[in-house]
Regions:
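Catalytic-core regions of core metabolic enzymes
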Residues: 1-263, 267, 271-278, 285-287, ...
């Protein structure tokens, strides 16, 4: 990681981790990366007992309890992804964007079904879905469009008219009550890729807030255009939501108050506590049996 922090061509750092062998070293490198403006994203095995056993058998290291890993990543500004696909697609969300103030997301779309699949997953993961602010509604009225007040900014097919999608996205990105925006494009992404993604490319460029694009059904040409423009684009709603939540959960590194224990040492400590508790319970049970016999 240290080498990548110093590499001028590296913009973000992706980690596939079976275990963390040296917590101090990784923490220091991740903090250097944060100071250099290079986000560190991680996918780590070990959420389940089976995953921890696989990591142990393959690497010979202790994978560590999931909560300890989460706390370690959070303290050192390492964004943890739950899906490998999300890890590979998420970098543009983080590059050039500081940690957000909250977890407030607007979902703007021309296809209700595709947007609902992302919004549902975001809600399950803890995001707050923000309806269209009045500034967005006013801008859309100028284009002859009145939208509902639900959790989706649903432009319907009217969003394919010139200027409509761009007006909505521009005002959503400018709204103080929104931390990130998901753009969902429907079938126009397949048949008119340049027109479908043009307003996203135009309005997302230079924004201080990230934009996550999901196109349903999949449209490879549109995805390629977004990729070329440096905009995060996703092939599934699950990966889109996973990546965006990793961004929303990220915070600046916490102050170092004491020695950061490697995860395998944390795991050893927890195991020792469990053994001592087990011995205490056995001793208490034996004492109870003796007391019963005496009476």
């Amino acid at each position: 990681v240290d080498l990548l922090v110093d590499d001028p061509d590296t913009k973000s750092i992706l980690l596939f981790l079976e275990a963390v062998r040296d917590g101090d070293k990784l923490a220091a490198a991740a903090r250097r990366a944060y100071d250099a403006g290079k986000p560190v994203l991680a996918y780590k095995l070990g959420r389940s007992e089976a995953g921890r056993e696989l990591a142990l058998s393959h690497s010979g290291a202790i994978a560590g309890p999931a909560k300890a890993a989460d706390a370690f990543f959070q303290a050192n500004a390492i964004a943890r992804l739950e899906m490998l696909e999300g890890l590979l697609e998420a970098s543009p969300l983080f590059i050039g964007h500081p940690p957000p103030k909250g977890k407030r997301v607007a979902v703007v779309t021309t296809t209700g079904g595709g947007a609902a699949s992302v919004a549902d997953r975001l809600g399950m993961l803890g995001a707050t879905l923000v309806p269209a602010p009045e500034s967005v509604r006013t801008a859309l009225r100028e284009h002859g469009l009145e939208i509902g007040r639900g959790p989706l900014v649903d432009l319907t097919m009217a969003g394919t008219r010139e200027g409509v999608y761009g007006a909505a996205l521009e005002n959503l990105l400018a709204a103080d009550e929104i931390d990130a925006v998901v753009t969902v494009v429907g079938s126009s992404g397949q048949f008119k890729p340049e027109l479908a993604v043009a307003p996203i490319v135009e309005k997302a460029a230079g924004s201080s807030k990230p934009v996550a694009a999901f196109i349903a059904p999949q449209a490879d040409k549109s995805l390629a255009l977004l990729q070329e423009a440096g905009i995060a684009n996703f092939r599934t709603p699950e990966a889109c939501a996973d990546a965006l939540m990793a961004f929303l959960n990220r915070r600046a590194p916490r102050p170092v108050l004491h020695h950061v224990e490697p995860l395998h040492e944390v795991d050893d400590a927890l195991r020792d506590v469990a053994h001592r508790a087990h011995r205490a319970l056995r001793a208490a049970a034996n004492g109870l049996q003796l007391d019963i016999r005496l009476h």
